[in-house]
Swiss-Prot record:
It comes from Arabidopsis thaliana. This is Pentatricopeptide repeat-containing protein At1g33350. Gene3D superfamilies: Tetratricopeptide repeat domain. Residues 434-509 are annotated as: Type E motif. Signal peptide: none annotated. Pfam families: E_motif, PPR, PPR_2.
Amino acid sequence: MGTRVTQFSYLHAPSSHMAEQLLNQFISAVISKSRHLNHLKQVQSFMIVSGLSHSHFLCFKLLRFCTLRLCNLSYARFIFDRFSFPNTHLYAAVLTAYSSSLPLHASSAFSFFRLMVNRSVPRPNHFIYPLVLKSTPYLSSAFSTPLVHTHLFKSGFHLYVVVQTALLHSYASSVSHITLARQLFDEMSERNVVSWTAMLSGYARSGDISNAVALFEDMPERDVPSWNAILAACTQNGLFLEAVSLFRRMINEPSIRPNEVTVVCVLSACAQTGTLQLAKGIHAFAYRRDLSSDVFVSNSLVDLYGKCGNLEEASSVFKMASKKSLTAWNSMINCFALHGRSEEAIAVFEEMMKLNINDIKPDHITFIGLLNACTHGGLVSKGRGYFDLMTNRFGIEPRIEHYGCLIDLLGRAGRFDEALEVMSTMKMKADEAIWGSLLNACKIHGHLDLAEVAVKNLVALNPNNGGYVAMMANLYGEMGNWEEARRARKMIKHQNAYKPPGWSRIEIDNEVHQFYSLDKSHPETEEIYMILDSLISF
């Protein structure tokens, strides 16, 4: 009887270097063709039976496939823990997986690094340190980064540029370590655009916008991420006009090509300043660069047009979006609510529930929009219903913003007993916004006694804001109690309180002009007032 020979007969041939190489190639190919975890387990079993479970090369392949394709970190760790003498590449494979799943696996990454240090063989190198330094900003201990810093200094790897940059990024990611980050930055033997951007982002994160801008201006070269970092810094710190100005500079740089992050940052600034014409130009720019289809850009456009009052354009962008995220739905609901179109806001929510009930669930922002819509529309019953829906059906714990909306809704409707009852059930203390909305409601309905209680609490929360006492003085005047009105006015003077000045913006030729009440610092004040007087005289 003849012997049956298969295409895999060489797998059971006598051991040789060539046979082992062929076997390694075969198993490597099988790993790359695997589709799920059971396949991988079969391959691992075959490696054990074939005496190849000690192969660093194949174990590395298993780990990479398990983490990158299957995203199964627990089984990857299972594979690693059964390897007798792991090398640096295997440690790096697991650390890469942990550092790619931050902040979820930050503590696992740091513990794994400490395991490697305690074993002493192999020692961490310039590949390992940057990986563990990614995790340290997410740890609760403020000493994690300095601990790694001390260890890498002793090992001599602190001189590697890639390690220095990772260390800088780790320090700069923590507000408490920003001084150490700057010290390290100044001592770096070689600074590249990545290290400059890391330091810039650190200043932005700590709110030190002046140092962030100064550093940006000193940069010898700038790339798109560094431009995006300074744009985000300005936007996040309320310098919206400066962000718009920087964007204009950016698009005039011949070697710089703005991306989706750029557009999102500048659209956010435009939304806050109300620069609709400039925003339309940015929308056209994004369309020409094929960026408008990006889900984050699309969401930003909906938010922008909604805040600027162009709800038709916001609806158009929303409807054209190929994939509508929860952020887009929330933006649309909040846009309609902001402009008093309550029924349309509610209709968007009902559509979201009907089309996406299994894919997208509303969050706390959704219900803030709905409650605001009910407030502007005076829909008390619906507002109460949505508040109950949020807690009972979707299990969302009410935040102070939700309570504020509901109390505002009840107060505007003159249902003060119900508003006070809601306040008594809150797990947190009422803030300035809640007492302020209650004071406004008292002014509408002439509820003097409760207004006095509201002002007392508002003054305790913010003694420097004289606007609340001024409102109370006006309410006393409207009620004919001039003595109390005079007393309230004197209180403002004695407490050195101030009333925040009103302001407005106007956009002319893509340039924003901002005016404050009684402010005459504008260089063209005389001409502006002359035109204003001529308009009033008509």
